[in-house]
Structure formats: structure tokens, C-alpha cells
A protein has these predicted regions:
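Class I (Rossmann-like) S-adenosyl-L-methionine-dependent methyltransferase catalytic domain
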Residues: 1-25, 31-90, 131-201
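N-terminal cationic-hydrophobic initiation segments that often serve targeting/anchoring roles
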Residues: 16-17, 111, 123
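Gly/Ser/Thr-rich loops at beta-strand to alpha-helix junctions
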Residues: 30-31, 108
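Residues at alpha-helix caps and immediate loop-helix transition turns in enzyme cores, especially N-
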Residues: 34, 114-115
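A short SAM/SAH-binding and catalytic strip from SAM-dependent methyltransferases
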Residues: 98-114
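A short glycine-rich, Lys/Arg-flanked "PGG" loop and its adjoining helix->strand segment in the class I
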Residues: 116-131
Length: 201
């Protein structure tokens, strides 16, 4: 098992500990271990595997373009338009719905058009005082991982079939710019090329 101590998770849970019946959005796949852990802590959890949804959406768009006769709107659709269209059916939640968001390493995989739009949406669905936990690779990872919670300060990295190509390595300044609307941030640097960022609305 590939388990790492997560100071970011520990602090994320501490920040949410005074919210009764807090709502958490997990942007990874459904893991029973994560669901059980959060339910035992009396949180309500919603899961939306955003990276898989994005991949499936792109595959569907490519197929649609492939079968569209040339001349019938056959030009290549822009990345901006794709991002906009994707978010018409994804991350559809009321404003201030969640007290915490587990974003994992999603931002490393999104393109420059989708990323700010996702960030804008997450900011709107996050309750004031709510927190986002995100992971950033300080170099391209050797393999694609998914993440699940083991306990209050540990996460397990699970090797998985590659869903998307690692798009970028963020510099610290870029991370702060991405989360510019948030009122505070804290970074935890691990020895395994993985940085954790905790961002408070």
C-alpha cells in the first residue's frame, strides 16, 4: 500500500470540525473507505469524478465531430467553448453548498481554458469559510494515481489507468494566482514530490 501522511487533510478536517453536518464534495472516484470515514465524522458527502467526466465529455465531442458532415458546423471547436459546454452539465450545485472540497491533483491535468472556469465554479459552490484541499506535483508523476482517505491524517495513492496526461507543474506563484480569490492559503511540502495546498474562502 502506498500511504502518505497528509498534514493538509489533517488541517482540512480540523477547519471543518466545528461545522455540524458539514457537506463535502469529493472530486475523485467513489471510494467506500473515504465515504465511510467522512460519514463516521457526520459529514454529508457528494462525489463527482470530474476528471473522468471531462475525459468522457471530450471523447463524446470528438465522436460527434467525427460523424458530422463537413460543412455542417464541421470546424474544430475551441477549447474555451468545450470548457464552457462541459460546465453546463458538470459541477451543478447551488451557491455556498459545500463546506469542503477534496480536489486532489485535478488542477495538474486541466487545460488553461477549463481550469479557471472550474475554479470559478468551485469558489461559488463553496460556503464562506469553506476549504479546498488540492495536491500539486512538483515534477511530472511516473504514473497516474487516484486518492482515498485512510484516516484523519493519511491518504492512500492508488495506481490507476491513465485518464489524462499530466498538463503542467505549477510554480508556487501560479498556485497563489489560481486561488487568488481565496482569503488564505497554506502549503505543505512532502518528500514525495507532492505539495498539498489548503485554501480558505
Amino acid at each position: 500500500m502506498n500511504i502518505r501522511v497528509s498534514n493538509g487533510l489533517k488541517e482540512f478536517l480540523w477547519l471543518l470540525s466545528d461545522v455540524r453536518g458539514g457537506r463535502i464534495l469529493d472530486l475523485g472516484p467513489v471510494w467506500q473507505a473515504t465515504v465511510n470515514f467522512l460519514i463516521e465524522k457526520h459529514y454529508r458527502i457528494s462525489t463527482e469524478d470530474l476528471l473522468r467526466s471531462w475525459k468522457d465529455f471530450l471523447t463524446g465531442e470528438e465522436e460527434r465531430l467525427r460523424v458530422t458532415p463537413v460543412g455542417d458546423d464541421g470546424e474544430k471547436i475551441s477549447q474555451a467553448l468545450l470548457a464552457q459546454k462541459f460546465l453546463e452539465t458538470s459541477l451543478q450545485y447551488p451557491e455556498d453548498q459545500f463546506h469542503g472540497v477534496l480536489a486532489w491533483d485535478l488542477f495538474d491535468y486541466f487545460d488553461a481554458e477549463l481550469m479557471p472556469r472550474v475554479m470559478e465554479r468551485l469558489y461559488s459552490v463553496l460556503h464562506p469559510g469553506g476549504a479546498i484541499l488540492a495536491l500539486f506535483h512538483s515534477r511530472p508523476p511516473d504514473r497516474f494515481h487516484r486518492y482515498r482517505i485512510v484516516d484523519g491524517q493519511s491518504i492512500e495513492l492508488l495506481s490507476a489507468p491513465t485518464l489524462a496526461v499530466h498538463a503542467r507543474v505549477f510554480q508556487n506563484r501560479e498556485i497563489l494566482d489560481l486561488f487568488g480569490k481565496f482569503r488564505s492559503s497554506k502549503t505543505f511540502v512532502g518528500r514525495d514530490q507532492l505539495r498539498e495546498g489548503l485554501f480558505l474562502k
